[in-house]
From Swiss-Prot:
General function of this protein: Part of the accessory SecA2/SecY2 system specifically required for export of possible cell wall proteins. The central subunit of a protein translocation channel.
Gene3D superfamilies according to UniProt: SecY subunit domain
GO CC terms: plasma membrane
InterPro entries: SecY/SEC61-alpha, SecY2, SecY_dom_sf
Top-level taxonomic group: Bacteria
Subunit structure: Component of the accessory SecA2/SecY2 protein translocase complex required to export cell wall proteins. May form heterotrimers with SecE and SecG subunits.
Protein name as it appears in the record: Accessory Sec system protein translocase subunit SecY2
Its membrane topology: Multi-pass membrane protein
Transmembrane segments annotated in the record for this chain: 14-34, 60-80, 102-122, 128-148, 152-172, 184-204, 238-258, 272-292, 335-355, 362-382
Length: 399
């Protein structure tokens, strides 16, 4: 009976998520300009980056910007709250939403202006309707953010299903991949590298770092081991989505400011066609992944919990000493996970510089890696829902 009930709740959540995805697919097919392929012949990774945050630049549609501005706003808020996590946890849901929406609108205005300016530069549209197009793109972004937010409450995995759908759509739009003209040996090498990368990602996602501690409530004769478990990469696939959205937004803002100032400066070094641009992104990915992981682990909160319930790490004293101990362990775990994920992303990115004629195929492989990583996270989230639904009646009594 309980099992039927828990599956019924899960089915309702999945059904709601499917409804959200139908709205997203419908909106992403509403073209607001009758032209296609603005980026078809250049900056393939720019399209990939935008598709990784739920956007689509194959055509200018309602959801072209995706969730990029929102994810970037989350980074800004996370950095502001990082110094004082206690105050951040005391904020109400409406306060958090208010800050997120304001910053999201500002970033969406910047990004929409850059995208439309690119269309004008390529003579796809006239500059007379730029304000209207910006309004549509910003409104579309805010609608998509609202859908993702509703999916967090009533669906599964928040923004991840939207990004997953965007990636699948992007893979099908990549027609060049199906016209390969490379040697069999090179193709086998690419496939083997892809499989190895996926296995490493799976290892990272399933690995845990465990810290044994003494539980004062565990008085049984056959004592089961008690430990604090952290994932090797606590940030998961969301760190890749956030780093890509921040990179795209920074790139857009720098180019936009240069255009407004009338500068003819060449910012090719910020693109993925340049090793400096790739290095900048890899460093950004490592730093943001580390910060997000530390934010999620929240060692100060865990140290306070141990101080209140009496549990301790032998021979560490409770309180500040426990917090310092947890911080040292958390730094090791978070840096390791962040660097490993960044290295997996760095290999295909630098490969595009060594074999430029295979850049589209390599980007395709990278999209596939990210797609599988997000799928793993979605699968784990579903298992978590089933676990908590199974014990929901007990948890509601005491929580």
């Amino acid at each position: 009976m309980i099992k039927k009930h828990e599956y019924k709740i899960l089915y309702k959540r999945i059904l709601f998520t499917c409804f959200i995805l139908i709205v997203y697919i419908f909106g992403s097919n509403i073209s607001i300009v009758g032209s296609e392929g603005i980026y078809d012949n250049k900056d393939t990774f720019f399209k990939l980056a935008v598709s990784n945050v739920g956007g689509d630049l194959h055509t200018l549609n309602v959801f072209s910007l995706g969730l990029g501005p929102w994810l970037t706003s989350l980074v800004i808020i996370m950095l502001l709250n990082y110094r004082n996590l206690d105050q951040a946890t005391k904020q109400t849901r409406s306060e958090k939403h208010y800050k997120e929406r304001i910053i999201t609108i500002v970033f969406a205005i910047f990004q929409s202006y850059f995208v439309i300016s690119t269309y004008i530069h390529n003579n796809f549209i006239k500059d007379s309707n730029i304000i209207l197009l910006m309004l549509i793109l910003v409104a579309g972004t805010m609608l998509l953010v609202w859908l993702a937010d509703q999916n967090i409450t009533y669906g599964i995995c928040g923004p991840m299903p939207i990004v997953l759908t965007s990636l699948i759509k992007s893979l099908f739009n990549n027609q060049h991949f199906f016209k390969l003209s490379v040697s069999v040996l090179l193709l086998i090498l690419v496939i083997v590298t892809l499989v190895i990368a996926l296995l490493i990602l799976l290892f990272i996602e399933l690995s845990e770092y465990r810290l044994n501690y003494k539980d004062i409530m565990n008085n049984s004769t056959n004592k089961t081991p008690t430990y604090l478990a952290w994932k090797l990469n606590p940030a998961g696939s969301i760190s890749i989505m956030i780093s890509l959205s921040v990179y795209v937004l920074l790139n857009n803002m720098i180019n936009l400011i240069a255009t407004l100032l009338g500068s003819n400066a060449n910012f090719e070094f910020l693109s993925f066609a340049n090793p400096i641009g790739i290095m900048f992104y890899i460093v950004l990915q490592i730093v943001l992944s580390y910060l997000l992981s530390r934010f999620l682990i929240n060692t100060k909160k865990k140290a306070d919990e141990f101080l209140k319930n009496g549990n301790y790490f032998d021979p560490i004293r409770p309180g500040r000493e426990t917090e310092r101990y947890l911080n040292s362990k958390a730094r090791r775990v978070c840096w390791t996970g962040a660097i490993l994920v960044a290295l997996i992303l760095a290999v295909p990115l630098y490969s595009t510089l060594l074999v430029p004629n295979l850049s589209t195929e390599i980007y395709f492989s990278m999209q596939l890696i990210i797609l599988v990583y997000i799928s793993i996270n979605i699968g784990e989230t579903i298992r978590t829902y089933l676990y908590f639904d199974r014990y929901k009646q007990i948890l509601n009594k005491y929580w």
